From Swiss-Prot:
It comes from Rhodococcus jostii (strain RHA1). The keyword Chaperone applies. Disulfide bonds: none annotated. GO terms for molecular function: ATP binding; ATP-dependent protein folding chaperone. This is Probable chaperonin-like protein PrmG.
Length: 549
């Protein structure tokens, strides 16, 4: 198919138009008094949200060059959400400001590659400055304040999340579930989590959340590669007779065996999910043995002498519930013998004391935390499905922000830490166009604070000017409209979220600034037309393919 091209200033201007379209839709949600966006759904009621990444996912522009710019900024939100689960609106606002200032400099004659290097060096200095400012969580009150702020100042959500995170600690796991009852509740249950998800999206039970959730499943644990139908059929028959879902934790499942399991899910004849077994190399069998003790099953391996063809229900583990996402698996309520589990934990602790290599020590610490970790389940209810979805998004954002704060500490919030971090750039010795790149970052750092103030009904430029002259850590509280110490006022942000937002924004902005050519598929003015001389379009009135844009 023919391509359409744009070059130099024209290409960058069209890309910037898309950047602005997406960012303008997202930035009105920033801050404690940010507004909502209403998103149309092809099926069901519309979604009302102030979650940046949720809004960004829905945006697709008609003009293809502008759409490329919008998709690049969408990547900023997606990347930030993937790393820390929050800060997507801040990242989008920063990206828009950096793109605007950077393109203005390039159009004025600056060398884009040198501008890019200046941006990268400036961001590195700002991140180091933020790290120095960061302080550790002071207690449950700090947890509650972070969660409350991330949930658009909802104290009910803040209290529930702080209670859950404080209970499970750093090694525990907190998950969210929809509830039929109004309000929020927190349930504490024993659970195990590891960082491997399903190997096929066709196995999800909740397409909207892209999760596979099974209650009381049978769990096959093996370090073998399963490719043939005869390898997996005995386990399927056991699960079918018991009328229970089948979860397969294996080194690899592929070929006809995987096709059989996927087909069973698609035709709803057999519920199953396949997850790559945790661990690598020689550690995989050891981690599978940990799970076998917790779940009450056996590891099917060459060393144990049990073959896949010999499997019975006694060889399979089980649990109360298992939740599998694209990247994580959470097991709740393992049906293993508690005495054997305690003995296994004691054995691992003994191995940890004797371990001399740092990698072995870290691996054993992870395995111990996995077996002793607790899971807190936050159940979210709403009066309508629209309210439920909106509240779920806020709970998930607040939870991600709180866990990030526990992990890496906190900085002054409300855009203050970023707005005041320009002071660290004063000692950065850059010349020429690299100095211009540094100025791009310096001007962009105040943009989140400006929009937090604007959304709260204040003059953004005036607020930025005042905060720039305040002592470090003192800023603008958009909720009260007053200036003061952000930590004393409880206006704080996780350092990890702030860092991820800045780095993601700078990455995409640097790429856009150095763009000279944009290439898209040629847009058909009348797709599906059959033009005949003297007759016009012979396909007029017929169903025709829609334009890809």
């Amino acid at each position: 198919m023919a391509k359409e091209l744009r070059y130099n200033t024209d290409a960058r201007a069209r890309l910037e138009h898309g950047v602005n379209a997406l960012a303008d839709a997202v930035k009105v949600t920033l801050g404690p008094k940010g507004r909502n966006a209403v998103l149309e759904k092809l099926t069901g009621p519309p979604t009302i949200t102030n979650d940046g990444v949720t809004i960004a996912r829905e945006i697709q522009l008609r003009e293809p060059f502008a759409n490329m710019g919008a998709q690049l900024v969408k990547e900023v939100a997606m990347k930030t959400n993937g790393v820390v689960g929050d800060g997507t609106t801040t990242a989008t606002v920063l990206a828009q400001a950096m793109v605007r200032e950077g393109l203005r400099s390039v159009d004025a004659g600056a060398n884009p590659m040198r501008v890019r290097r200046g941006i990268e060096r400036a961001v590195s200095v700002v991140v180091d400055s933020l790290h120095e400012q960061a302080s550790q969580i002071g207690g449950q009150s700090d947890l509650q304040r972070i969660a409350t702020l991330a949930a658009s100042d909802d104290e009910v959500i803040g209290h529930a999340i702080s209670k859950a995170v404080d209970y499970v600690g750093k090694s525990g796991v907190v998950t969210t579930e929809e509830s039929d009852t109004l309000g929020l509740s927190v349930d504490i249950v024993d659970g195990i989590e590891f960082d491997h998800g399903y190997i096929s999206g066709y196995m999800v039970t909740d397409p909207e959340r892209m999760e596979a959730v099974h209650t009381n499943p049978l769990i096959l644990l093996t370090n073998k590669k399963i490719t043939q139908v005869q390898d997996i059929m005995p386990s399927i028959e056991v699960a079918k007779r018991a009328d229970r879902p089948l979860v397969v934790l294996a080194e690899e499942v592929d070929g006809p065996a995987l096709q059989l399991l996927v087909g069973g899910n698609m035709h709803k004849t057999m519920q199953s999910v396949v997850v790559r077994a945790p661990g690598f190399g020689h550690r995989r069998v050891a981690e599978l043995e940990d799970l076998a003790v917790a779940l009450g099953g056996h590891v099917i391996a060459k060393d144990t002498g049990i073959e896949l063809s010999e499997i019975s229900v006694e060889h399979l583990g089980s649990c109360d519930r298992i939740t599998v996402t694209e990247n994580e698996t959470t097991i709740v309520g393992g049906h293993g013998d508690q005495r054997l589990l305690d003995a296994r934990i004691a054995q691992l602790e003994s191995q940890h004391e004797r371990a001399k290599i740092e990698a072995d020590q870290e691996s054993l610490e992870l395995r111990i935390a996995r077996l002793t970790g607790r899971v807190a389940v936050i159940r979210v209810g709403g009066a309508t499905s629209v309210e439920l979805k909106e509240r779920m998004l806020r709970v998930e954002d607040a939870l991600a922000a709180t866990r990030a704060a526990v992990e890496a500490g906190i900085v002054s919030g409300g855009g203050t830490a970023l707005a005041q971090s320009h002071r660290a750039l004063a000692d950065l010795d850059l010349t020429g166009d690299e100095a211009i790149g540094c100025d791009v970052v310096r001007r962009a750092l105040a943009e989140p604070l400006r929009w937090i103030a604007i959304n709260a009904g204040f003059d953004g430029d005036e607020v930025v000017e005042v905060v720039a002259g305040l002592p470090l850590g003192h800023g603008f509280n958009a909720l009260t409209g007053e200036y003061g110490d952000m930590f004393d006022d409880g206006v704080i942000d996780p350092f990890k979220v702030t860092r991820a937002a800045l780095e993601s924004a700078a990455s995409i902005a640097a790429l856009l600034i150095t763009t000279e050519t944009a290439v898209v598929e040629e847009v058909l003015g009348n797709p599906g037309a059959i033009m005949a001389p003297g007759f016009g379009d012979l396909a007029e009135g017929m169903v025709r393919p829609s334009n890809i844009y």
